[in-house]
Swiss-Prot record:
GO biological process: L-histidine biosynthetic process
Impact reported for S188A: In strain: IL1403
Domain of life: Bacteria
Similarity comment: family membership: Belongs to the imidazoleglycerol-phosphate dehydratase family.
The protein's name in its UniProt record: Imidazoleglycerol-phosphate dehydratase
Binding-site residues, substrate: 13, 39-47, 68-72, 94, 116, 165-173, 195-197
Entry's transmembrane regions: none
Gene of this entry: hisB
Organism: Lactococcus lactis subsp. lactis (strain IL1403) (Streptococcus lactis)
Alphabetized UniProt keyword annotations: Amino-acid biosynthesis, Cytoplasm, Histidine biosynthesis, Lyase, Manganese, Metal-binding
Enzyme nomenclature, EC number: 4.2.1.19
Length: 200
């Protein structure tokens, strides 16, 4: 079974090329021009064992906008690629849950590849710091776009933490580990849809 997908997303605001292999080895080739976002997506790739290539350009490079559009559109493209690569979802474990201690911060991701997109996001990032050109308040928007385009029910909870970088890093790492669990194949359920309804 090959679980690979590629998407090209071009709008008046962004240009994105993204490809993913869900059965990869954690190889990342990420270039969005937003250093902190590249760092987080590289961590997502490594901890999920996906292979991920992203080339992204946005209007923040040409007309002086903030990188809001590119951050959200990368998440949209990533979500769509994950959904497409999963295909009919036969045999997947469907659920994933992982807690990451990131120094003083503790973050949990719980997710369900349910086909019912939803985001619950509990974290205090209201200070809207800038990290490497990345607006921290965009973190919730990133995960919302990811969840709604991948068809995932996604719960992200910051239990506690002080360093914003650590909290966000914990979110990306815990999401990666939970995705790794959820997309993995349950050898006892190969060829079966993981739902009593027979459809996801």
């Amino acid at each position: 079974m090959t679980r690979i997908s590629h998407i090209t997303r071009n709008t008046k605001e962004t240009q994105i090329e993204l490809s993913i292999n869900l059965d990869g080895t954690g190889q990342a080739d990420i270039s969005t021009g937003i250093g902190f976002l590249d760092h987080m997506l590289t961590l997502l790739t490594f901890h999920s064992d996906f292979d991920l290539k992203i080339i992204g350009h946005g209007d923040h490079e040409t007309v002086g906008m903030d990188p809001h559009h590119l951050i959200e559109d990368v998440a949209i493209a990533l979500g769509k690629c994950i959904s497409e690569a999963l295909g009919n979802k036969l045999g997947i474990r469907r659920y994933g849950s992982f807690t990451i201690p990131m120094d003083e911060a503790l973050v949990t991701c719980d997710l369900d590849i349910s086909g019912r997109p939803y985001l619950v996001f509990h974290a205090d990032l209201s200070g809207n710091q800038k990290l490497g050109g990345y607006d921290t308040e965009m973190t919730e928007e990133f995960f919302r776009a990811l969840a709604f385009n991948a068809g995932i029910t996604l719960h992200l909870n910051e239990h506690y933490g002080q360093n914003t970088h650590h909290i966000i890093e914990g979110m990306f790492k815990s999401t990666a580990r939970a995705l790794k669990q959820a997309v993995s194949i349950d050898e006892s359920k190969v060829g079966e849809i993981p739902s009593s309804k027979g459809v996801l």
